[in-house]
Amino acid sequence: MNFKYIVAVSFLIASAYARSEENDEQSLSQRDVLEEESLREIRGIGAKILGGVKTALKGALKELASTYVNGKRTAEDHEVMKRLEAVMRDLDSLDYPEEAAERETRGFNQEEIANLFTKKEKRILGPVISTIGGVLGGLLKNLG
């Protein structure tokens, strides 16, 4: 009789262990799904914030450009306009990264393309901020 109890208890333990393993796998996959959904939400919020900043920045740059167009332009003003146009092109390439990447990366292999994207992000943000600072400083200098 002891043998029957040992077999029955062993079977119960094995089935309980199998159920716990299955539950662990399900909870891990559910956790992965929840983490992925959280990341998507965070990326969505970041994209909305970045979109708002880009829109505001574009509006400010267009206003600055129209100010320079209406007045007399010196060589320095002409350089500032060129920089503003370059910044506007870079901002437009942020809005449509696939098209810009397609134009810039024809003939590159995948690793070079990945490196180009990270370099482009760094290349765009630095000059955009410095150009905007320079333009605003120049405007304040001219107004003051």
Swiss-Prot record:
Q: Which UniProt keywords apply?
A: Amidation, Amphibian defense peptide, Antibiotic, Antimicrobial, Cleavage on pair of basic residues, Cytolysis, Fungicide, Hemolysis, Secreted, Signal
Q: Which Pfam families match?
A: Bombinin (PF05298)
Positions bearing Leucine amide? L143
Q: Does the keyword Amino-acid biosynthesis apply?
A: no
Sites where Asparagine amide occurs are at: N70
GO biological process assignments: defense response to bacterium; defense response to fungus; killing of cells of another organism
Q: What is its main location?
A: secreted
Where does the signal sequence lie? 1-18
Record's function text: Maximin-7 shows antimicrobial activity against bacteria and against the fungus C.albicans. It has little hemolytic activity.
The protein's name: Maximins 7/H1
- Say which species the protein is native to: Bombina maxima
Tell me the lineage of the source organism: Eukaryota, Metazoa, Chordata, Craniata, Vertebrata
